[in-house]
Amino acid sequence: MESLIYMSSHILSTEFLDGQGLGNQLWAYAATRSLSERLGFGFKLRGFERFKGSAFLSISEHVNISIERDNCTSKLILPTYHERQYYDPELKLLSTYFDEEVLNLRSSHDLKGYFQSEQYFFGDIEKLKHYFIIDAKILEKNSIPSDICVLNLRGGEYKRFKDLILPQSYWQNAQKNMMELYGISKFLVVTDDYRYAKKIFPQYEIVSGNVGDCYAVLNSAKYVVASNSSFSYFPIKTNLNSPIVIAPQYWSRFNNSYKRWAAPANFYADWLWQGADGEIQGIEGCIGCVQDTIQFYRSEYFVSCPPSQLNQGFSWKILIPTMLRPHIKKFLSYFFPTKIG
């Protein structure tokens, strides 16, 4: 447990949830902890037993809170602050960007939302290396040479959404760019979906199955081609090798005809962004699109409603008993690895 510099009378808390992916957990943790520091509050993490990185990452359950107050706080129900989100019916997603209103909190709150903007770190990315300490043995075991590029392929449930899954051309163009720009010709695949990766990249070594190994490989790579998944952000940003990263332009709606960044929160200034045509853009070529997207939501989205009122449409999934779904999904993935996983 790290030393407590001061004891705050107010706290910000967040909770790890059932079904929440590791990337989303790390964003919720890091953003809430950073905001608590900014506001001079204590920090409290709830649901640590649901942390998907506990086998290889060390994090703090509370910061700047006395043990007595921590025990008391665990029994309290705090008021909730919901990060502002924008439902975009044309892109069919909930979009977010830096919610500056959270800085106006003057009392203890529980934060709920995605909180995936770098602006929540207030210009200090280096502190992430203190927030997340990776197990040295796991990192050493998964260290890779500097002349290998990691392809962080996301499959799984992404394959059910044609607007979300990245086309094979994205990966082919990114490999070509790595070769032409940096002379890289060796590639390694890190993925949550081994069968899908084997279908797409049969010629490459694949790291899959153990999330700690996947995280550590990304944390040691000098060159990375990222998917539009939140998982890769923290192993890349805490990587001591200052990696070169190519990521998909517009993020979760690659090549969308509206040319909106989906979401503006998921724009990271020091990454390279590749379009559907294979062209690479830096911050200068993308920041205008990001700012235009934010302005569009600010000017056009001014009606609030509860999440239950959003039109989610009908899904055949509701007709399948919950206990049977993972077994059916696994069975079908053997026959349709590029569609189901």
Give residue ranges: language-model regions.
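Histidine-anchored nucleotide/phosphate-binding helix
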Residues: 26-37, 172, 176
